[in-house]
Each structure stands twice: as C-alpha cells, then as structure tokens.
Amino acid sequence: MIARKARALTAVLIFTLSIPGPSVFAGPGAPPVEIVLKIRYESLHGGRILPMLYGGFVELLDDLVPGMWAEMLGDRGFEGVLPTSTWDYFRGEPNLCDRDWDKSPDWSRDAARPFNDRQSCRLDVRAGVPARLTQSGLAVRKGMDYPVTGHWRGDSPSLRVRLSLKTLLPDGSWMTLAALDLSKPGPEWGKFAGELRSNGTTDRAVFEVEARGQGHLWLDQLSLMPGDNVDGWRRDVVEAMKELGPPVVRWGGSTVDPGPYRWSDALGDRDLRPSFVNRVWGRRDTNDVGVEEFVRLCRAVGAEPLVCVSLGDGVESARRMVEYLNGPAGSEWGRKRATNGRAEPYGVRYWQVGNEIDSPGYVQSLVAFARAVRGADPGAVVLSSFPTKELIDIAAPDIQIVCPHYYQPDLDGVEADLRKIEGWIRDSAGRDRIRMGVTEWNIDAGNWGLGRGKLNSLGCAIFEARFLNVLHRHSDFVVLACRSNMTNSFSGGTIQTNAAGLYRTPSFLVMAMYRNHSRPVPLRVAADVPAVVDVTACASEDRSGATVFIVNAGKEPARVALDLSDFGPGFAVRGGEVVKDAQERGQVDIINSFADPARIVRVKIDKPSGNVVTIPALSIAAIDCGR
C-alpha cells in the first residue's frame, strides 16, 4: 500500500474517498424490495471462480505485524521507539508497536559494547537499593507459561537478578504473578533463558527486571512470549486466520519496495538481526519477522505465500531469495536455509516483482527478474507490479499474472478498468496464459484520521461484498486477489488485535462467508434489481449445488424469490448464511469492537418459505441451493 498520499497509475487506481453514500445505500423509509431472480443453468463465461480470489495481505505496516507476532516486549533491543506514521489513529489509542520501556533513573541506553545493533540497556545498581527495568501494558493468562530469554553481562560478582510479572492492585499494592531468579551474569555477553508461569489473568501486567548488589548490569535482546505461540505467531491470530481461510497471503508492500527492508537481514537467529528504520511508516522495525517467518505462518494457516521481491535490491538478490526459500539444501542459499534449521525447501510458488513500481525501465527490469526467478525455480509463477499494454506485450513470454491495485469505492470504475486490461490481454500474444491478480484492494488507502474507523464498519463490509461480486463476474481473467490488510493497519485489517485478544471485523465475516460458500462455475442471473441490490451466483462443476450471493445495501429488507427451474425438479433453497447487524438498526457505520465483538454477526438464514428468502436490510447473504 502506498503511504502518505494517494497515487493514480495506469490501471492502478488508488483514491481517497468516503464510504459510498445515497447512490449505494438507500435512505430510511425506502419501500420494501421485491425481487425475482432466475438462476440460469448456464455459465457466465468460460472461467472459474477460484478460491485464490479470497486472499489476504501482510506487510510491515506499523501495527500490522506487531499485532500478529507473539513477542510481548516492545523495543526488546533497546534501540529506541520512533513515532509511527503521521496518520491519526482512528481510535486515538496507542498501537502495539508503540510500547516503550517505562522511564526510570535506574536505567539508560548505552552504546558501549552492545550485544547486537547500536545500543543495549544499562542498569545502575547501588548498594542496598534495587534497580528496576519495567515495561507495562502486558496481558497474561492464568496458568500460561511465558518463556523469557535475553543477553546480559555484569561488572560485579555481587549482582543478583530477578525477573517477574506483576500487577498493581486497587489498594496500591503489587501482586507478583510469576518470578524467576537468575544466576550471576558474567563479564562477557551470555544468554539466559527461563520461564514465567502466571498465577493470574490481567491486561495490566508489568514485566520487571530487578537487580540487587552493586555495579552495572547490561541487558540486550530481551524476549517474552506466551508458551502457546505458533512458530512465534500469536495462537489466537493463527486460529482466526484458519477460520478466515485465505488461500493465498501476500508479503510485500511499500516497506519492501522501495523501502529500506532487506530480506537477507531477517534470517537466522532473531537476536542477531539488525533493526531498521521503516522510512515509509515511521517506526523502527526489529526485523524479528522476515520472509521465512511469513512463509511458516502461511503454512500454519493453510495458505499459499505470495512474496514480493524488491526491484531496488537487484536481480541477484531476487535469485538468492528464491534459492533460499525453494532451492535444494545443497545449493549455496539452500545451505544457509538448512543452517538456519530448515533442510526442506519451502516451495513458494508465487513471486511478484516489485510493489507499485511504474518507472520507465520497469518492463525491461521485469523480464530480467522473471528470468532470474524462474531460473532459480522453473515452477515459479511470476507476477508484475502493475499492468500496462506495453508491459503485457513485451513481458508476455516471461510472466503469468499482471496486477492492478484498487483502493476506491467506485466499482463501475473498477469494472471499466478490468475490462480495459482484459482487452490488452486478448490482443496480446499471451492471451491464453496471462491473467490478472488484484494483489491489493480495499475501499481506501488514504489518511482519513478518525474517519478511517469506517474501514471496520458494516458499510465497508457491504462494499467489499460488492467488490467480490465484481471479481466473480470477471473471474475468467481475475484469478487471484489479496484484500488489504490482515490485521490492524489503522483499522484496515480484517482482524483487530490488542495485547489481550482480538475481534473479527464485519469484513472478516464477509470474506470468510464468501470463501466457505463460493463454487467454481459462475452462473448467469436474469433479474431486474434495484441499485441497492447486487447479485452473483455460482455452481459446482456437476451443477448439483449452487450458491447465490445477495448484497442488500438498502435500509429495507429485500424479499427475494429464486427461480431455480433450470436445474430441474427438486432443486431448491437449502439454507445459507447472512452477515448483518445483530440489532438491525439500519445504520451503515455500526462496527464490532473489543467491548462488543459480536454487534455484526454471521448467522444462519431463517428457514426459507419454499424458494423465497428475506434478506435483511444492510446485509450480505449466501444462499445455498441443491437437491
């Protein structure tokens, strides 16, 4: 996603606009909608609705990865916390990646002999007075083990160190939730490891390092994680992603290209990785999460990884990355992977060259990159950074997918742009093999300030369902899409997290419902529907079952009669689901939240009366039909 300002590229539409208004959402008092839909036993076109249309996106954007990664300590390497993006926080709350160490005269950052990077922490311990380093705002659960590690050194044999988790009680006293006494630090850097088991549950826990004796204690690369993490990722996020079911997840964005991120810096022992300043989004990134951690996340949730390679790093860097992830253990970079603990190749299939790069020399660079990527892995599928007619004409023999990005509510404009790109493909030598992948999409990418909270709303979910219907109608050419973003992201994520938990946004519910109910064959639908209603239908290959997706953006229910006679006797509505406001208040700005995570719900459709179904106002429905 492009930061700071909106951009407009050829076939890459990124606008800053509001949630659709009256032209899409019918006003209060609109008459009830009566609709007859005839579902044709006829394919809309020769293409298929592929599961890959329901993908997601992960990038090093501010609070996105910190909200998924299980590390509980901020600034664990003591390099200093930098302000994040200048965008206003939509809730006015600090993000997870903003957590700093509590201020105290007991400790300071020291540039002399750090274990890693530029600085470490120095605790000044005076005789008879304990020195403390603390970090507040942590969430812990009763009975959970929290592995803790770090690197330390000291200049006095009198030093004694205790690690603890504590919480402040209403009476002003402190309750110790867990404690661990460490052995003495030596004069050179060494690693300590232990475990803290919490005897209570709170979202107001404090991690504390307490040193007694006399002298100086240095600490670096401290880490505290819940014991139930999944390869370093938060278990609750992993489980939510499994429920969401994205078949593909993209790794990339502005940080990767043209940003300062270097994939090879984020390999191996994370305590030894250099941090970097993310100039695009403003924060200092620890590099704890690199492409290898991302690929393992994808494998854990059953998704295919789609990896962006940096144009700025050059062709050889791209070749090395492919070899690192996919090469045999005997290859140069495959050996490095094996040394880091993974002998078997990861088998990453999808590779995108750059992110929203439209420089004059890009087409020639794309060809060189594509040949290098496929030279390292002949089975690789290569995606472009953006689509133009020139790119398709020149690069057709070397790539498989061209990729527009859409951040706008004008779906007529999106469809017009898709048709334009389809025309370029039809007119090219690659007409039989080139297809499209919308590798980023949402209603907006710009700076709304507090208005960005609308990205969490029912109104945005209704827009996203209509966008998915557009993809269904163009699925003969669009074979892959990645909704932006997976978590947090200034309200843009389908999953919103804090230190203690998460909730699923209305968009999450829509994406999961489409993923679970869609079928491969797009069908023709004969109907005269009002502008507030959007319909697509799809069937299984043998036509034994069908699903009708209905988006009702009106503020009155829609009574829908389905004509399924083309499918023969006994073919009828069998059930389905609907995403709606649990209170049915007729408001598009309703959201889920930590206080009320189930205001927008995904529920079973009321028992149909024959083939007649009532779709609630401001809702999205998936109606399943069969014998």
Spans of model-derived segments:
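Alpha-helical scaffolding within the catalytic cores
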Residues: 33-43, 105-109, 232-236, 286-294, ...
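Hydrophobic faces of well-ordered beta-strands that scaffold small-molecule active sites
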Residues: 53-58, 249-251, 305-308, 349-353, ...
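C-terminal beta-sandwich/jelly-roll accessory domains of carbohydrate-active enzymes
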Residues: 553-627
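Bacterial N-terminal signal peptides
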Residues: 10-21
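Conserved, mostly hydrophobic/aromatic
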Residues: 56, 150, 245, 298, ...
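Active-site neighborhood of glycoside hydrolase catalytic domains
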Residues: 324, 328, 340-349, 354-474
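Aromatic/acidic polysaccharide-binding cleft in carbohydrate-active enzymes
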Residues: 55, 60-61, 434-544
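Extracellular and organelle-lumenal recognition/adhesion modules and their flexible linkers in secreted
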Residues: 25-287, 304, 308, 312-313, ...
